[in-house]
Amino acid sequence: MKRIHLCVLAGVLATACASSKPDYSFLTNDQWAAELRKRGVDPQFVSNPLTSTSDMKETAEQLARPGGPGGPVEKLRNLQSGLFDETQFPFRYQNRGTFTAAEAFYRREGNCLSFTNLFVSLSRSIGIGTKSAFVTRRIPTERDGDLIIVNTHVVAVYFEGLPKPYIFDFDRRPHERVEDAKPLDDLWVTALYLNNRGADELRAAHPEIATRYFEYATRLAPEFVPAWGNLGVARRRLGDLPGAFEAYRRALERSADDPTILGNLASLYRFVGKESEAQAALAAIDLSRATPHVLVVRGDLELIKGNVSGALRLYKRARRQAPATADPWVGMARAELARNHPERARNYLERALTLEPNDPSALAFRQQLEEANRRARNTAK
């Protein structure tokens, strides 16, 4: 699938933390393993994403300079600055590659989630109680064929005794300013780690491994909708269509108008020959929440229905959100060809292939366009 981040409302964080439920934050390794077993997850097959080592504590003390002036926030700022300074901490940031905090520390590489978990683990090792927080803005997705994989983004938060939380963001890519986030306990952090690991395995064409990761994620955080959606994708890849439908049902129980879930459900309905159900699922999508890839899928539906201008509007909207992604450009090319504008279609296609030369949908449309040109030449003869 194609392409799953510093101020937060204090009230939102306080509400998210105020609960009569048990708090699974700041678990020891033994406590963490015991909680996993209670939920049917074998800790022998799952690494604790927040575990620290003595080497990590030593590095944290050096970067945060806890012996110097300043309180916890000052130390956290120093720690973040040190992690961003390649002369102090060489680190290769990558969009993919989900590691535990310890793995990211020793490998000196990882994605946003890995980097955030590393920061949380390092700060906890020197006695500062930070948490990871799930960003609740539009969730990033990736498209693979006719399915959409959901990624997640987290930040680190610290708000002990403070009127307003401090947010530490480790996504090095351009992105929207974080306006809302949900603090996570250690089981939720593990679920996010497993969800991202599952997405990595799906990209590597290992759906059986991905399925196990997603199933574990849903056991640790049953309300985590993206994990249910990704479980549906993985089960479909394995040919378990009833299991895929069940995963999407569980997701929609928790978020009835989730655009990505509805888009993948529509794809599954279409795969089994239920076109009316597929169109109903797509029509139920709340376009105000839709990711670029969901907008493209919705545009495809309008194109199939013959609403070319409506499809083109959706493709252009997707392009505005993700101008460096091939999908919207391919959609626009298809719409222009349907409007009998082959030259404009060719220009859009060239733009898509410039952005992503190996994009399957762009390559397939290029072949379609070449065949259309051959037919036109033969007709002219």
Mark where each language-model region is.
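Canonical positions in the second alpha-helix
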Residues: 216-217, 250-251, 281-285, 317-318, ...
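Canonical tetratricopeptide repeat
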Residues: 196, 230, 264, 297, ...
